[in-house]
Amino acid sequence: MLVHLFRVGIRGGPFPGRLLPPLRFQTFSAVRYSDGYRSSSLFWAVAHLRSQLWAHLPRAPLAPRWSPSAWCWVGGALLGPMVLSKHPHLCLVALCEAEEATPASSTPHVVGSRFNWKLFWQFLRPHLLVLGVAVVLALGAALVNVQIPLLLGQLVEIVAKYTRDHVGSFMTESQNLSTHLLILYGVQGLLTFGYLVLLSHVGERMAVDMRRALFSSLLRQDIAFFDANKTGQLVSRLTTDVQEFKSSFKLVISQGLRSCTQVAGCLVSLSMLSTRLTLLLMLATPALMGVGTLMGSGLRKLSRQCQEQIARAMGVADEALGNVRTVRAFAMEQREEERYGAELEACRCRAEELGRGIALSQGLSNIAFNCMVLGTLFIGGSLVAGQQLTGGDLMSFLVASQTVQRSMANLSVLFGQVVRGLSAGARVFEYMALNPCIPLSGGCCVPKEQLRGSVTFQNVCFSYPCRPGFEVLKDFTLTLPPGKIVALVGQSGGGKTTVASLLERFYDPTAGVVMLDGRDLRTLDPSWLRGQVVGFISQEPVLFGTTIMENIRFGKLEASDEEVYAAAREANAHEFITSFPEGYNTIVGERGTTLSGGQKQRLAIARALIKQPTVLILDEATSALDAESERVVQEALDRASAGRTVLVIAHRLSTVRGAHRIVVMADGRVWEAGTHEELLKKGGLYAELIRRQALDAPRTAAPLPKKPEGPRNHQHKS
């Protein structure tokens, strides 16, 4: 019965559009379970475990029998039913691959939170040698610890053998045994030190590799992915979840493997000392297995909910701290504190509920173990009285059973950490396994000298993935001639910024095609398109908290200092940059908060121009500036637009009068198009927008304050 094991079959790998596969339970022996198999209480418990897990997992066709990703061995001869009775979730480690979660609606490639053993193996494989040494040392420390109860029993026999009158004989006979014990204690300490150091080495390196891979995966996701997920939740995956998984991984080896080995070894020793007492201890196994399985299922669900709530709280904090100036401007500190407090309160409730469950599990196990010790003393004392067991053997049995109890207690503490770690690891691997719809690279590149810059939108329809039922663009058709300026105007919500997003291929149209020089954008390399062809300048440019030099060079990493200076001059930025004490090495602060709006905008223009784009997108580039800053920035934009295909998005119609073509958008379509004069003569929507802005201008313009008059000199008549 000690070598009776579970083998859990899971088919690995995501299958879009399919349910996750079921489990198959087999024994290490030739016995195979069927639904009606009930030959013993242990087999009944195994079948009950199977039914419980089957109810919580989805189903699909079975995997090939010997597929390397299909079978995960949990246990060996060292993991008998006694171990699984206390720590059934060591079996469930393999089951978390089939854990079902709700997929994100806006990311079609998400298949749910499931532990990806294939990815885990990729991170573990480079460290297998070091990990193998750590495992050997941990097993050695555990086996040394198994020998100690037997030697203590022999020492007790020597103590009982001699009286006070034979102290010399006692010291002589116990010297070798005591020396042996001291050596074992020293070896155990050295082995423990060795495997803990090696585990720390493996765990930290794996954590770094996982964070790097997760960050790389997140950066490669579609813009739609970030539309649907908060930044704080993603940062939580990089920090909290990876840390949780790393801790669980190290604990499974340092405590789990060692404790399981000690339990198995001590059980073998116990059976050699007294088969009757050992069998009595094994009677509690099936009941503990069933209770542990039921409680583990509920605790796993609570752990997942707790982690999701923590991620939501972090999202609220990240949003408030990232927009602290807006919060301060509206005096909304109290409201943000209340929002964050509400999320923390929900976290507390979930965590306390999880803690109560873990405490209940540990409390019940302690009661069971204490009853087992009491029963051992009672029955063992009877055997000693009947001369069926010596006092030394009973002492060895008690110490060995205490070792089992202590190991089980460690597993009980480890239980909650493993549950949390597996949930965290499943979520980390879930994001690593995501495949973006629009890859970062792949496709053809057009030589720079062959690019003309002609852009065509042909019968384009588009809905944002997070709002699939709302169509933003409807049969939209537009051509941007090479070297010309085309302006998009219209009321808010008409789809102007969406056109720019499609041109940068942040999204793909749901219908129709976007072409560059007659080539479908979907056939071109996205990184080449964004990195060398299209330059983008938005209304509120985002700068990084580094130097001005590095912010401009962000548009072209290999650019020389002279290229940076030239781009700054072209953007009318060189003069104000050199006025700073540190010049181009000036730190701009987080998101460029130390610069004015006009200064940030000119740096953004320089960043876009340094890569010499063929197509330039100006999305409300001057709408947030004052008159003087707008004049300086507009001069830079006029120089930047020369010889390039330019798409201008504007609300202030006065800024687009010089465009070669003005396109008025309404309801996701081209309403009318022409030059400024042509559209005014037509008297359509554009003329109406001009008239409205002319009427609104006097009301929105703030009158200049009058210059205060100085004191008058009054002449008094005499």
Swiss-Prot record:
Annotated region (Disordered), positions in chain: 697-718
- Superkingdom of this entry's organism? Eukaryota
One biological process GO term for this chain?
Answer: potassium ion transmembrane transport
What is the membrane topology listed in the Swiss-Prot or TrEMBL record? Multi-pass membrane protein
Query: By its UniProt entry, which SUPFAM superfamilies does this protein fall under?
Result: ABC transporter transmembrane region, P-loop containing nucleoside triphosphate hydrolases
The answer to whether keyword Ribonucleoprotein applies is no
Activity control mechanisms: Channel activity inhibited by ATP via ABCB8/MITOSUR subunit.
Tell me a GO cellular component: mitochondrial inner membrane
ABC transporter domain location is: 455-692
**Keywords of the record:** ATP-binding, Ion transport, Membrane, Mitochondrion, Mitochondrion inner membrane, Nucleotide-binding, Potassium, Potassium transport, Transit peptide, Transmembrane, Transmembrane helix, Transport
Its assembly, as annotated, is: The mitochondrial potassium channel (mitoK(ATP)) is composed of 4 subunits of CCDC51/MITOK and 4 subunits of ABCB8/MITOSUR. Physically interacts with PAAT. Interacts with Neuropilin-1 (NRP1) in mitochondria.
Function as written in the Swiss-Prot or TrEMBL entry: ATP-binding subunit of the mitochondrial ATP-gated potassium channel (mitoK(ATP)). Together with pore-forming subunit CCDC51/MITOK of the mitoK(ATP) channel, mediates ATP-dependent potassium currents across the mitochondrial inner membrane. An increase in ATP intracellular levels closes the channel, inhibiting K(+) transport, whereas a decrease in ATP levels enhances K(+) uptake in the mitochondrial matrix. Plays a role in mitochondrial iron transport.
In its UniProt entry, what is this protein called? Mitochondrial potassium channel ATP-binding subunit
